[in-house]
């Protein structure tokens, strides 16, 4: 009995060669629309889909394969006489292989000038239906959605006259993943179009970007997936220019670093980070000086860290950076001389280019946190705050220099793990106290790290002070200005302590926990 294949593809890469090989093996080819034209033009004989259905393609191609003569040929179980008799009685010929890929919905909605009508028109209906029918009947039917699988199918057909059950099952699983992702993307697009922020069903689709050697620890398996609709300002979109492939921990740290740098748009800024916490942030009129400040913030912790810059790296800055052991450098661009310095002297240094002009787009993405048996979803902590909305709650007002430092520190503190404390001046961090289970311990940690650089320093806290003992510790260290959200039932005790020691304290009214 002659084997039959139905071919209908939007991605025509390799399809002519695949069809030619099938012809050599004696297969009969059914095809549709543009695929049939491409095959006919290449000299591959095909049968038109309407010759099988007895019904013309119509409505601009919207209706062409949704017909019992197609789906009966795909779904008929070869092990059931009743199915085979029904097919025979209704003159339905069996189809043994389906090669289909879908209308380019993703590519369409990524176009900057796409219209809603264009998006709707590129939703494939017949393609997913054929794929699902064939995949459901994988006991008898081979289904191919990815040109990368053409070779393995041809090899098995040439060797054995049919594909193995294991191959058919694997390809069916791939099809169901593919159609599920396709539908999820359509659902995501329509959900956004209607402005639904809390859908009763959450469908997300990601594409495998990089298999990883291991996860957070060597005993953990891991992979890196990228959103099907890529975010421009993200570690997934960065271009790697040098060094080993990124590890699981590299990617998490790099993501944390670029989230921080987004908040420092106006001035050349350098962020150094280790284990998801900033260990140095420097801001200046030029990127070289910003590097100096970030490095001087904590010359010990920066060792083996990640550095992200929001301006092009020049030769002078590269010379300074190459003297420090770093895992990753991320910047919008590098001068040729700077890149040569870094690559020539650091063969394993991971150097990434990530244009900074798209950074605001990444702020609109939701954040997902996995818990056992569930998923937490929240919008990002990117509330637009203005110092004009802050409240000075003490008798003493901040000086102009203190006000600048308080604003700088408030940008930085929301990226420190809670309980988070940071000590800064107006252009660099001096001490970081992250992740302690009581706030006064974080205060002590940050102050101890700042040590002899406390003259003129200020302190920021990601959440309110539950007791006045925090203010007592701060005053004892000689720090004269504090910024915190406020909101404790004991706020007045902290205010009175600040007044007692001549401190100025600002309440922002916005908490910035980070867990």
Swiss-Prot record:
The keyword Glycoprotein does not apply. GO terms for biological process: 'de novo' IMP biosynthetic process. It catalyses: (6R)-10-formyltetrahydrofolate + 5-amino-1-(5-phospho-beta-D-ribosyl)imidazole-4-carboxamide = 5-formamido-1-(5-phospho-D-ribosyl)imidazole-4-carboxamide + (6S)-5,6,7,8-tetrahydrofolate; IMP + H2O = 5-formamido-1-(5-phospho-D-ribosyl)imidazole-4-carboxamide. Pfam families: AICARFT_IMPCHas (PF01808), MGS (PF02142). Pathway: Purine metabolism; IMP biosynthesis via de novo pathway; 5-formamido-1-(5-phospho-D-ribosyl)imidazole-4-carboxamide from 5-amino-1-(5-phospho-D-ribosyl)imidazole-4-carboxamide (10-formyl THF route): step 1/1; Purine metabolism; IMP biosynthesis via de novo pathway; IMP from 5-formamido-1-(5-phospho-D-ribosyl)imidazole-4-carboxamide: step 1/1. InterPro entries: AICAR_Tfase_dup_dom_sf, Cytidine_deaminase-like, MGS-like_dom, MGS-like_dom_sf, PurH-like. Residues 1-145 form the MGS-like domain. The keyword Isomerase does not apply. Its EC number is 2.1.2.3, 3.5.4.10. Keywords: Hydrolase, Multifunctional enzyme, Purine biosynthesis, Transferase. GO terms for molecular function: IMP cyclohydrolase activity; phosphoribosylaminoimidazolecarboxamide formyltransferase activity. GO terms for cellular component: cytosol. It comes from the Bacteria. Belongs to the PurH family. HAMAP family: PurH. NCBIfam families: PRK00881.1, purH. The IMP cyclohydrolase activity resides in the N-terminal region. This is Bifunctional purine biosynthesis protein PurH. It comes from Streptococcus pneumoniae (strain Hungary19A-6).
